[in-house]
Amino acid sequence: MGYVVSTFYRFVHLSNYYDIQSVLKEFCVQHDIKGTIILAEQGINATIAGAQSALNQFFSFLDLDNRLKDIQHHESFSTHNPFSKMKVKLRNELVRLGIENFDNSVCGEYVSPQNWDDLISRSDVYTIDTRNTYEINFGKFKNAINPQTKCFRDFPEWAVSWASDKVNQDPIIAMYCTGGIRCEKSTAFMKNLGFNKVYHLKGGILEYFKSTKNTNNLWEGDCFTFDDRIVVDDNLVPGRVKCVSCDVHVTREEMKSVTRGNVLCFNCREVAKV
């Protein structure tokens, strides 16, 4: 049996987000759906996996709430369920930028996957990867700037420093991330800093892979995923990952305990404990 992996998010006011937690958890458990859903007053952010029929029922269930109706989701596939359990978490901030009461309603302009290559190929465009360094190490777009962040909360400090000599130049900025939520929020931050021409990849890297197959080879490497697959290639096929210490391919079981891109085989992990 194959599994569908679905990522989705929506910034929307959910005043009763804490009441939704148990309802979503119960539905997912009943339909053998696993993964992580994050709920906050600002909306919902999730990656879940299960049978296609189960996910179809899940999104029909979400449609019952007008705030979550017709939510756009991006699908990829796996031979196994890349999640071991179902989690529905409550957060004060949907995606943690670390700035209290930050308003991300005024954000950048979407660019479709089909138009993305033309944008980032321009010599007057700064392409910024809003993911963390451990993710970028597996792959990125050609010539993209790596902010060298360990977590998304580090991004504002980097952005303020980077912007200090560029705001007055009124540059064109193109931003991207895995599924779209971090680049959407980061474009709002860049707009807040005074940049006007700010764009972000609609649907993120995963939708870009699905829509374009990386035809122009502007993507280099694999894309890190926050599940047991660790990475997928530009055909959305789980890649083979090597241990960062001994360079052997790690097994699927070893991948299940990988944290933040620190890929170690069992042997090297044991050595590291000594």
Swiss-Prot record:
CDD domains: RHOD_YceA (cd01518). Gene3D superfamilies: 3.30.70.100, Rhodanese-like domain. Residues 121-217 form the Rhodanese domain. It catalyses: uridine(34) in tRNA + AH2 + O2 = 5-hydroxyuridine(34) in tRNA + A + H2O. GO terms for molecular function: oxidoreductase activity, acting on paired donors, with incorporation or reduction of molecular oxygen. It is an enzyme of class 1 (oxidoreductase). Belongs to the TrhO family. Catalyzes oxygen-dependent 5-hydroxyuridine (ho5U) modification at position 34 in tRNAs. This is tRNA uridine(34) hydroxylase. It comes from Ehrlichia canis (strain Jake).
